[in-house]
């Protein structure tokens, strides 16, 4: 990067800093994996975002963490591959494209499958471009030369091969099962596509008459329309109330069908009446009961949610219209005895908003138990297992894997991987293969596509060239090193990648899984359209820059925890960057055209020089160690404290003494240390704030083209000086204590005061005498006395630090009479406040009636006033000494 400016611009402007840098990085190919055999590979595949629109804050957080990892590893000398890509997102994208078509007054059926897919691909190209632009705005170091899409030809080949092999192993089968059905989009849904909402419904209590006329049996349901498909009534085998009825039959009201009373342990004796209706075609639990008792399955609804011919006179009605009509008929027949209001959780389609129907359907399934067993067994092998960070999520994962159900993988959509199965037009024979049958004219391909998660489960290896196991990238970069993702998709994605990786590559797809939480608003609420509390990361970047947003996102929570987003805290980070900018300007203005090779740390160093280099070593160690543990928050806080407190507030101020002095050797050493420390700090900070660190680094004396490929800092033992660090800590404690005393008595630093220091021994005396120039510079004493045998003067403010006592005579600091009068007035005020609040708290009526929070607030006030009153009393006592 050409750099003609000697100094940074006066003001930090994130927009001008970030403009053009990303394109410069791409042109330099700094993010492309090199395949250099001398370097150890490090691989992350990006969790592919859906090509459905804009990226949200969760994506920005997730990808920022990955960028921090890959930038750090690249600087540490690894051959880094961070592979980008996007997911076709079957139902989500199809819903968006269909919505766009509806605006034009046409449906997908008007277009036909091929034309509709052309529209979907047009959508994909448009939104993939938007996503790449957003990745660039965030500053993500992705290797675009290897970008993948789940419907790419190579990935589609992998999907077909996996389907066929699982089918041939008997692990994929076709059968009837209860699935989540969306009547609006007419497709099966995965569990993650079902949003559960609390809805006001009702329990409908009904009497089913015993067929022999000897009475009735009472039960309740929240979905009365499904009773039209009832094929049994069940009770618990140990329920004494109903034992005598087991084996008898009831007559289904309205329908008139005779159905058996069966015994099954699924029934809870203590819930409701202890009797449940069994509808095998419309409830997953009833389906299982039906299988155990060989009950018929009567489907009473069509795919669009209307009632079918099995529903009798309700045929053609919408399911909810049917509910109203049926309830009315049941009331008139005297069967419905009570409607009890009931709040309950009802599944809704994430895409259409329709109430999801448990629905009997012929679908394709993956037999999960054999695959899950291998994945669970892997976790017993310490060297081969997948490591979860935080560790507690391993138990979450294992519990789910040990209680897994077969996976419905077919979807009634057009956008996606079409199932590689064909049915013979005459014989009905099923053919499954990676290629179509030779006599294709005699076969019809299955119309369904695969669940999006099926292809996503292959993402870590299909993107690297599998099923060609000789592919260069697959051989070099698989298995991957880390996966960064949210805890909400451990079941739907992480687990499936693990068992598919084991089944088809024989090893774990990634070594570590770093789990983060969800982004919430400042009140801890999940961000949603309904609450209107969503925040566009591009707007945050526009206002405060990518660096500020990234630093907040990466340091705002611990692994596995949710993140409360705060625009105020992003602004605070912007202020931090502004401080870095101003400190960097100071350093650069004092470089005196220094070249990189002129940086010399061998000269004689002051205590401040030795201290800042020791603190830099400690910061390098802390940041590196915490990065290795995925503790980005801890790493970021180490950097923040070092930059803000040690470097900006202390060292730069202390560096002004030699810089503005006459000693040329001291000036040169100070310039070298300023340049070195700022260079090393920018490298440590670079993964968090790539833009501003590159900009500053380019202005510093440096070696190499870009900070993105500069070497990661390492601890230098030759620059470690713990004794000097201890000396500096004493100086800092003294200076802080003096500043605190001055603040306490409202005496400005510009006013000179006497200062006496009693050193505890000769060693401390020697230290303080040697470094007295710092005390004089930062404490502004009219006279400084340092001795080991000082007596405490009368009427002086004192402070005790490790190794010394400080005395500042009050007469120098304040007018004693005026201060005494002021403190007496303060004491009187606090006496009244204590009396008022104690009177309130002793009032039994107040304590009995006031909310707990109000009482707690008053008690806190009492404690605060008591402490302040005691401090004033102590100050008055000091005046009288």
Curated annotation (Swiss-Prot):
Binding positions for ATP per the UniProt entry: 529
Chain location of the short sequence motif 'HIGH' region per the record: 49-59
CC terms in the record's Gene Ontology section: cytosol
Listed GO biological process terms: valyl-tRNA aminoacylation
Locations listed in the record: Cytoplasm
Catalytic activity of the protein: tRNA(Val) + L-valine + ATP = L-valyl-tRNA(Val) + AMP + diphosphate
Record keyword Nucleus present: no
Alphabetical UniProt keywords: Aminoacyl-tRNA synthetase, ATP-binding, Coiled coil, Cytoplasm, Ligase, Nucleotide-binding, Protein biosynthesis
Residue numbers covered by motif 'KMSKS' region: 526-530
EC numbers for this chain: 6.1.1.9
A Pfam family this chain is assigned to: Val_tRNA-synt_C
Entry GO MF terms: aminoacyl-tRNA deacylase activity; ATP binding; valine-tRNA ligase activity
Record flagged with keyword Protein biosynthesis: yes
Domain comment as written in the entry: ValRS has two distinct active sites: one for aminoacylation and one for editing. The misactivated threonine is translocated from the active site to the editing site.
Protein family (similarity comment): Belongs to the class-I aminoacyl-tRNA synthetase family. ValS type 1 subfamily.
HAMAP family, sorted: Val_tRNA_synth_type1 (MF_02004)
Cross-referenced NCBIfam families: PRK05729.1, valS
UniProt protein name: Valine--tRNA ligase
Species annotation: Bacillus cereus (strain ZK / E33L)
Lineage, highest ranks first: Bacteria, Bacillati, Bacillota, Bacilli, Bacillales
Name of encoding gene: valS
């Amino acid at each position: 990067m050409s750099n003609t400016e000697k100094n940074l611009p006066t003001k930090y402007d994130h927009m001008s800093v970030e403009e053009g840098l990303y394109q410069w990085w791409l042109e330099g190919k700094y993010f492309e994996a090199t395949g250099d055999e001398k370097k150890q590979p490090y691989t992350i595949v990006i969790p592919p975002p859906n090509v459905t629109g804009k990226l949200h804050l969760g994506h920005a957080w997730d990808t920022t963490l990955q960028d921090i990892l890959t930038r750090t590893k690249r600087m540490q000398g690894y051959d880094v591959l961070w592979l980008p890509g996007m997911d076709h997102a079957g139902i989500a994208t199809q819903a968006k494209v269909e919505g766009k078509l509806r605006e034009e007054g046409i449906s997908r059926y008007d277009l036909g499958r091929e034309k509709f897919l052309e529209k979907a691909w047009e959508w994909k190209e448009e939104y993939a471009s938007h996503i790449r632009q957003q990745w660039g705005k965030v500053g993500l170091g992705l290797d675009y030369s290897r970008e993948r899409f789940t419907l790419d030809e190579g990935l589609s080949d992998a999907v077909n091969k996996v389907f066929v092999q699982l089918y041939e192993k008997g692990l994929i089968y076709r059968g009837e099962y209860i699935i989540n059905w969306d009547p609006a989009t007419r497709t099966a849904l995965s569990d993650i596509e079902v949003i559960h909402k609390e809805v006001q419904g009702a329990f409908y209590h009904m009497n089913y008459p015993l067929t022999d006329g000897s009475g009735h049996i009472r039960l309740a349901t929240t979905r009365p329309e499904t009773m039209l498909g009832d094929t049994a009534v069940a009770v618990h085998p140990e329920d004494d109330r109903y034992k005598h009825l087991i084996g008898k039959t009831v007559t289904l009201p309205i329908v008139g069908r005779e159905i058996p009373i069966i015994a099954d342990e699924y029934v809870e004796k203590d819930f409701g009446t202890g009797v449940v209706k069994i509808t095998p075609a419309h409830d997953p639990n009833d389906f299982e009961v039906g299988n155990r008792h060989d009950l018929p399955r009567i489907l009473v609804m069509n795919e669009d949610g209307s009632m079918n011919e099995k529903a009798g006179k309700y045929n053609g009605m919408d399911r909810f219209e049917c509910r109203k009509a049926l309830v009315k008929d049941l009331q008139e027949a005297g069967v419905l005895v009570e409607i009890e209001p009931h709040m309950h959780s009802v599944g809704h389609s994430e895409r259409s908003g329709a109430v999801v129907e448990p629905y009997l359907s012929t679908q394709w399934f993956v037999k999960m138990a054999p695959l899950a067993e291998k994945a669970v067994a892997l976790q017993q092998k310490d060297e081969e297992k997948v490591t979860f960070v935080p560790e507690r999520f391993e138990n979450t994962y294992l519990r789910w894997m040990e209680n897994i159900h077969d996976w419905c993988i077919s979807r009634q959509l057009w956008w996606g991987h079409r199932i590689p199965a064909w049915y013979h037009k005459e014989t009905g024979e099923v053919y499954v293969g990676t290629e179509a049958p030779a006599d294709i004219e005699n076969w019809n391909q299955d119309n369904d596509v695969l669940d999006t998660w099926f292809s996503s489960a292959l993402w870590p290896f299909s993107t690297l060239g599998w099923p060609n196991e000789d592919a260069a990238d697959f051989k070099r970069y698989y298995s991957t090193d880390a996966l960064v993702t949210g805890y909400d998709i451990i079941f739907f994605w992480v687990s499936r990648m693990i068992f598919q990786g084991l089944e088809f590559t024989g090893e774990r797809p990634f070594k570590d899984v770093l789990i983060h939480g969800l982004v919430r608003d400042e009140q801890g609420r999940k961000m949603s359209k309904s609450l209107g509390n969503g925040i566009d990361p591009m707007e945050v970047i526009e206002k405060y820059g990518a660096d500020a947003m990234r630093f907040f996102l990466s340091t705002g929570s611990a692994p596995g925890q949710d993140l409360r987003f705060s625009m105020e805290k992003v602004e605070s980070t912007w202020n931090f960057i502004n401080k870095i900018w101003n400190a960097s300007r100071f350093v650069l203005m004092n470089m005196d055209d220094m070249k990189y090779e002129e940086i010399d740390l061998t000269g004689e160093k002051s205590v401040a020089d030795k201290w800042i280099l020791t603190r830099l070593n400690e910061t390098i160690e802390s940041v590196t160690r915490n990065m290795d543990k995925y503790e980005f928050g801890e790493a970021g806080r180490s950097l923040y404290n070092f930059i803000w407190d040690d470097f900006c507030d202390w060292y730069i101020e202390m560096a002004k003494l030699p810089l503005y002095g006459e000693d040329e050797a001291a000036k040169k050493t100070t310039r070298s240390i300023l340049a070195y420390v700022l260079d090393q700090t920018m490298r440590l900070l670079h993964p968090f704030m790539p833009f501003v660190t590159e900009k500053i680094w380019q202005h510093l004396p440096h070696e190499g083209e870009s900070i993105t490929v500069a070497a990661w800092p390492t601890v230098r033992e030759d620059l470690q000086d713990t004794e000097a660090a201890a000396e500096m800590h004493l100086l800092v404690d003294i200076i802080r204590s003096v500043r605190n005393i001055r603040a306490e008595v409202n005496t400005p630093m510009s006013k000179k005061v006497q200062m006496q220091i009693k050193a505890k021994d000769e060693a401390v005396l020697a230290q303080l005498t040697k470094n007295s120039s710092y005390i004089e510079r930062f404490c502004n004493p009219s006279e400084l006395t340092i001795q080991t045998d000082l007596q405490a003067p009368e009427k002086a403010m004192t402070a005790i630090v490790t190794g010394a006592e400080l005395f500042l005579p009050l007469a120098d600091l304040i007018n004693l009479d005026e201060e005494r009068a002021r403190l007496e007035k303060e004491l009187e005020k606090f006496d009244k406040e204590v009396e008022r609040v104690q009177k309130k708290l002793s009032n039994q009526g107040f304590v009995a009636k006031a909310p707990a929070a109000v009482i707690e607030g008053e008690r806190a006030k009492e404690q605060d006033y008591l402490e302040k009153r005691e401090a004033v009393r102590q100050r008055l006592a000091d005046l009288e000494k």
